[in-house]
Every structure is written in C-alpha cells, then in structure tokens.
Amino acid sequence: PPSGVSLWAELPGAQVVLGDRLVLNCAVAAGTGPLSFSWHRGGSGAPLATGARLELRHAGHNDSGHYQCRVSDGDSAAESDPLNVTVLGERDPRAGAEP
C-alpha cells in the first residue's frame, strides 16, 4: 500500500497573491504498482484534480483553504497532511516601481 505521502507548494508558506499562479506537488515514499493521485480541498469527497501536480493558474479568494493529496494503488489509499494555502489580497500596482 502507498505510504509516506508528502505535499508541498512551490511558493514559500503556500501563500500566493490573488491572480498569481500556485503549484502544489505530491509525492509518495513507498508504494508499488500503478499509483493514482487526487487532490482535495477542505475535506471534500470529490477530487479537484488528478495527477502528482496541482496548478492553480489564477488563484482566487475561494482557492484559500486546506489541501490534501490522496494516493491510491487501487486497493488502499493514503493521504498527505493538510497544507493550508492562503490567497493574499490584490497585487500592489506600485510594487517593483522606483520611488
């Protein structure tokens, strides 16, 4: 059975600015046979997506929450610990501009 499921964000602290892109990755330490990955938010039963990678192309306020990755080998499944994703407010149009 799959075990050691880990989940991480490509941005520090799993924080993303509203409208920016966020990528989450999932990996499994042990498991044999074909493995399937599914993504869940807030304990929802229906998967958001499948595959070892979840990409939110334009993060919105409703994308904040706890994400989990579930890995299954067809017979049994294991889940990652929840990762809290925070979508921050509007990007400051002055950011990066010279004073």
Predicted region positions:
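Extracellular/luminal immunoglobulin-like beta-sandwich modules
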Residues: P1, Q68-R91
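Solvent-exposed loop segments of extracellular immunoglobulin-like
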Residues: V28-G43
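Short beta-strand segments within Ig-like beta-sandwich modules, predominantly Fibronectin type-III
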Residues: G43-R53
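Surface-exposed loops/turns
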Residues: L18, T50, H61-S64
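Surface-exposed, proline-enriched loop/turn segments that connect beta strands in immunoglobulin-like
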Residues: L7-G13, R41-G43, A95-E98
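Short, flexible loop/turn segments at beta-strand junctions in immunoglobulin-like
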Residues: Q15, R57-G60
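A short beta-strand segment in extracellular, disulfide-stabilized domains
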Residues: Q15, D20-V28
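Conserved Ig-like domain signature around the intradomain disulfide
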Residues: L22-L24, L35-F37, N62-G74
